């Protein structure tokens, strides 16, 4: 039997910044247990007044708590004078955005 501390993280967030833009890559499950991690990881880029590209191309699961985190982050980035844009997404992310009528709320990169 393995302990919880040895289990791989349910969510991984990597932030890189260059040329006035932050790229945030999210992998794993974005849900009630991990949504706070995303918000915490984006606290600094959100206040930088830059474009924040959110790559959700490795998100395997997202629920309403994950969606709420995306909305909170988007508002924080906007309040900081920047803009949040979605890069890659998965069918799970696209489906949730479509079902909730929020597909147009998040501008897309390119």
For the regions a language model picked out, list residue spans one by one.
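STAS-like cytosolic regulatory interaction modules
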Residues: 1-61, 72-110
């Amino acid at each position: 039997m393995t302990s919880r501390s040895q289990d791989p993280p349910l969510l991984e967030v990597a932030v890189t910044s260059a040329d006035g833009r932050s790229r945030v890559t999210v992998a794993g499950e974005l849900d009630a247990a991990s949504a706070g991690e995303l918000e915490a990881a984006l606290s600094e880029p959100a206040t930088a007044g830059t474009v924040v590209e959110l790559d959700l191309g490795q998100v395997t699961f997202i629920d309403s708590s994950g969606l709420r985190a995306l909305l909170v982050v988007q508002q924080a980035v906007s309040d900081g004078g920047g803009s949040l844009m979605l890069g890659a997404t998965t069918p799970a992310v696209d489906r949730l955005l479509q079902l909730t009528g929020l597909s147009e709320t998040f501008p897309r990169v390119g």
